[in-house]
């Protein structure tokens, strides 16, 4: 049984109850939305994961990517990244490791967080293929499905799988004038496999078998966007939309099978086209939860892509995205370190709050009101507590403390609030 099959059978699970309480929404509404596929609760049956609801009418959620590379293999650092992610309010984590002993790294991350954990199995599939056959693109169906099953048994809560790349998708790509080609690493493995071997994508041709496997462990399928644009110049082009059409069809098959599913979206989109992308996805995928990387509305901010991501992410979430994948200052430059993780997460959480306020979320507005009252009352401790990052403003105030205890060192005795308050007392 999965969260979706239970919901379809009018069964309210403890995970649905938890999400309902967290969102301050009637649990029967949560059940109905899970049954229809509008909300997912990624939680593998083998793991004691903190339940998180992702979908329409819920708060915008934020994911943190972490993981090793072939150039930097430090399990302890990845564990610290996972701990920082939970400490600073991430809703989920993805282990994207490609260097070192991947099963051991995954095991340690699963052990050191209660958050839902996702993976991209194609990374491990490619490495196993290289070790066995000499190239990452020479994998066979046994390697693919054995890897997916093994990760499911380990407790992975959601998996990004590039099921929508087909021979027809690649024909569309080859006939397009796209500048950057395929920038998705997992998507590139599948694309190269199809082009070299002239075979169909096994994740597409064996999709029903894949669903049986995921259903057994209640792994949420995150349909990867292997044809996502890698730069603004390629946004909303035919390869991207062709794949999205296929993903919409696969969403229907997931729902029929009782497998929870969400859909991943583009990472580079000009600001004036963000809303269009969200509406296209929500229409083609029948309101499946939408998971976006950023998106980045400019490609010229290397070293500051957490800021561009927050700008694009706020508009994306306001326009329909439900799950924001953070972007760190290290994006497009190097592997992220712990400080990058913290900064990227905070920026993405700001975007989520901005969007939730704009959408009228009652919990988001309640926090804004609390902050207004705390500022009116010069309650600095409460302001720090309510801040998305409470540590930084505390340190900043300590670095240059005000002479007037209630004020800050910008206005001091000329604080507008204090001035009017004093005048009112006379």
From Swiss-Prot:
BP terms from Gene Ontology: thiamine biosynthetic process; thiamine diphosphate biosynthetic process
MF term (GO), any: carbon-carbon lyase activity
Keywords assigned: 4Fe-4S, Iron, Iron-sulfur, Lyase, Metal-binding, S-adenosyl-L-methionine, Thiamine biosynthesis, Zinc
Keyword RNA-binding among record annotations: no
Cofactor note: Binds 1 [4Fe-4S] cluster per subunit. The cluster is coordinated with 3 cysteines and an exchangeable S-adenosyl-L-methionine.
Ligand binding (substrate): 65, 94, 123, 162, 184-186, 225-228, 264, 291
Catalytic activity from the UniProt record: 5-amino-1-(5-phospho-beta-D-ribosyl)imidazole + S-adenosyl-L-methionine = 4-amino-2-methyl-5-(phosphooxymethyl)pyrimidine + CO + 5'-deoxyadenosine + formate + L-methionine + 3 H(+)
Cofactor annotation: [4Fe-4S] cluster
Pathway membership, UniProt: Cofactor biosynthesis; thiamine diphosphate biosynthesis
Binding site for Zn(2+): 268, 332
EC number in record: 4.1.99.17
A matching Pfam family: ThiC_Rad_SAM
Positions bound to [4Fe-4S] cluster: 408, 411, 415
Summary of the function given for this chain in its UniProt record: Catalyzes the synthesis of the hydroxymethylpyrimidine phosphate (HMP-P) moiety of thiamine from aminoimidazole ribotide (AIR) in a radical S-adenosyl-L-methionine (SAM)-dependent reaction.
Family: Belongs to the ThiC family.
HAMAP family the UniProt entry points to: ThiC (MF_00089)
Protein name: Phosphomethylpyrimidine synthase
Gene source species: Methanococcus aeolicus (strain ATCC BAA-1280 / DSM 17508 / OCM 812 / Nankai-3)
């Amino acid at each position: 049984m999965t969260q979706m099959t239970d919901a379809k059978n009018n069964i309210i699970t403890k995970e649905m109850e938890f999400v309902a309480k967290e969102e301050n929404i009637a649990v029967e509404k949560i059940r109905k939305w899970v049954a229809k596929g509008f909300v997912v609760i990624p939680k593998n049956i083998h793991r004691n994961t903190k339940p998180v609801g992702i979908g329409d009418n819920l708060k915008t959620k934020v994911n943190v990517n972490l993981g090793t590379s072939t150039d930097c293999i430090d399990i302890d650092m990845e564990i610290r990244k996972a701990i920082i992610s939970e400490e600073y309010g991430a809703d989920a984590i993805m282990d994207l490791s490609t260097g070192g002993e991947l099963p051991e790294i995954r095991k340690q991350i699963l052990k050191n967080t209660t958050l839902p954990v996702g993976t991209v199995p194609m990374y491990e599939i490619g490495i196993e293929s290289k070790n066995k056959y000499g190239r990452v693109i020479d994998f066979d169906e046994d390697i693919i499905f054995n890897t997916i099953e093994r990760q499911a048994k380990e407790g992975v809560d959601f998996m990004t799988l590039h099921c929508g790349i087909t021979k027809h998708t690649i024909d569309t790509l080859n006939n397009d004038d796209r500048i950057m080609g395929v920038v998705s690493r997992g998507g590139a493995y599948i694309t190269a496999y199809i082009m070299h071997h002239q075979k169909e994508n096994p994740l597409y041709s064996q999709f029903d078998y894949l669903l049986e496997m995921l259903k057994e462990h209640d792994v949420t399928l995150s349909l990867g966007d292997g044809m996502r644009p890698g730069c603004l110049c390629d946004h909303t082009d035919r390869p991207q939309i062709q794949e999205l059409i296929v993903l919409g069809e696969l969403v229907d098959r997931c729902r029929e099978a009782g497998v929870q599913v969400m859909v991943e979206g583009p990472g580079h989109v000009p600001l004036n086209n963000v809303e269009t992308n969200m509406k296209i996805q929500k229409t083609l995928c029948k309101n499946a939860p939408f998971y976006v990387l950023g998106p980045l509305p400019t490609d010229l901010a290397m070293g500051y892509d957490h800021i561009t991501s927050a700008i694009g992410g706020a508009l994306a979430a306001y326009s329909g995205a439900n799950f924001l994948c953070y972007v760190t200052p290290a994006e497009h430059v190097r592997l992220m370190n712990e400080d990058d993780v913290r900064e990227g997460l905070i920026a993405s959480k700001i975007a989520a709050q901005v969007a939730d306020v704009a959408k009228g979320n009652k919990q988001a507005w309640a926090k804004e009101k609390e902050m207004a009252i705390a500022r009116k009352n010069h309650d600095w401790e409460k302001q720090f507590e309510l801040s998305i990052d409470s540590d930084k403003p505390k340190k900043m105030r300590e670095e240059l403390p005000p002479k007037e205890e209630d004020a800050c060192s910008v206005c001091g005795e000329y604080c507008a609030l204090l001035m009017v308050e004093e005048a009112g007392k006379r």
